[in-house]
Amino acid sequence: MKLWGGRFTKETNELVNNFNASISFDQKFYKQDIEGSIAHATMLGKQGIIPESESEQIVEGLKGILADIESGKLEITDEYEDIHTFMEATLIERIGDAGKRLHTGRSRNDQVALDMRLFTRQEVLNTDAELKELMAVILRIMKENTHTFMPGFTHLQKAQPVTVAHHFGAYFEMFKRDRSRLHDIYERMNYCPLGAGALAGTTYPLDRELTASLLGFYGPTLNSMDSVSDRDYLIEFLSALSTIMMHLSRFSEEICIWNSNEYRFIELDDAFSTGSSIMPQKKNPDIAELVRGKTGRVYGALISLLTTMKGIPLAYNKDMQEDKELSFDAFDTAKGCISLFKGMIDTMKFNNKRMEASAKNGFTNATDAADYLVKKGVPFREAHGIVGQLVLMCIEKNIALDDLSLDEYKAVSPVFDEDIYEAISLQTCVDKRLTLGAPGPEVMNKVIAIYDKYMEEN
């Protein structure tokens, strides 16, 4: 069955049929196609555009098709051009001529615009739910590690001491912003294109407010040409997914570094690691590496759709069919990565002693030594130079700042006194950082309370 062909005098070339067909991938939103058709048929009946008895017959027929697909009784086959053709043909086969009235006042242009919007709307919600679960794991790790010291890095060099709670809090903030972007996308996209027709609406007295309400939208879209050609919501969602994947990729890179023999900050669970076919000793962070690798795949979907849309005149063009495969793949890839990442960090173990020892080395307390001098009246720029001399002395002797004698301190600056050792201890360096957003346990607990409230309210 074709939904068109009356003005054609030749059969379509088989290669053209195969090239044009989309059922191999758009069958993914069979449920949304049925939901949209049920709403449309219900509205047609209430408006008196078709008899209510036939509207009810169509609705029941569509519900039966949905039940049979989901039970496995009915298989979607690729002999049809697209999911819309399959649905209409199956409906007519089951209920007869009444099924031929379903497409009254509707085009495949607004039908597919609706289906994709319904499908994407649910994917936005699904992704948001996955992110929230990941954030719950991050928050649990934060609560358990407010006093677990580790080095903080800049330029991948040790900089200042922080805690695991503080480090993981940075990712909590990233994913919080990601969720905010998803919520914004939902607000903008949640308007119904059904009733836009091919591009110029229809002469039938459709009740677009009713169909929008039945489908859970805030209301109908306001321009029929934009309605059938808008893919902004998809571009926005793919952009948000790309940002999520970028955050996961950064996190994955750190997991790979921390898991290396040179760092040994963490131990990944066996269930989330793999081995080598030749090297018996290997325990590889493949999940983190694959998440990092799949980031480019999601980026590619975004760039592909932007490129597809950049030269398309109003309104609908067949180019837009290319939005589906790449979007479906990106949706599944991002959700899968979030879910696996959650399991990986939920089961990994921290090597607290190793991290603390690493935090004590590398002069992470040098800034605190400079601050010590500032509090005793030395201008910061002078203090910076003094501590730089001390660091050079330590490097030459292969010792830490803590290992210098008081005489060695005083030889560089007489301002130093016995209390320098307490001032540059790891505990003090972290505990004294009490500005909001810093790693000090006291302020960290306040931030955790804020995050708890966020998780309850969002």
Swiss-Prot record:
Pfam families: ASL_C2 (PF14698), Lyase_1 (PF00206). GO terms for cellular component: cytosol. Its main location: cytoplasm. It catalyses: 2-(N(omega)-L-arginino)succinate = fumarate + L-arginine. The keyword Lyase applies. GO terms for molecular function: argininosuccinate lyase activity. Pathway: Amino-acid biosynthesis; L-arginine biosynthesis; L-arginine from L-ornithine and carbamoyl phosphate: step 3/3. PROSITE patterns: FUMARATE_LYASES. It is found in: Cytoplasm. InterPro entries: Arg_succ_lyase_C, Argininosuccinate_lyase, Fumarase/histidase_N, Fumarate_lyase_CS, Fumarate_lyase_fam, Fumarate_lyase_N, L-Aspartase-like. Its EC number is 4.3.2.1. GO terms for biological process: arginine biosynthetic process via ornithine; L-arginine biosynthetic process. The keyword Cytoplasm applies. SUPFAM superfamilies: L-aspartase-like. Keywords: Amino-acid biosynthesis, Arginine biosynthesis, Cytoplasm, Lyase. Signal peptide: none annotated. Belongs to the lyase 1 family. Argininosuccinate lyase subfamily. This is Argininosuccinate lyase.
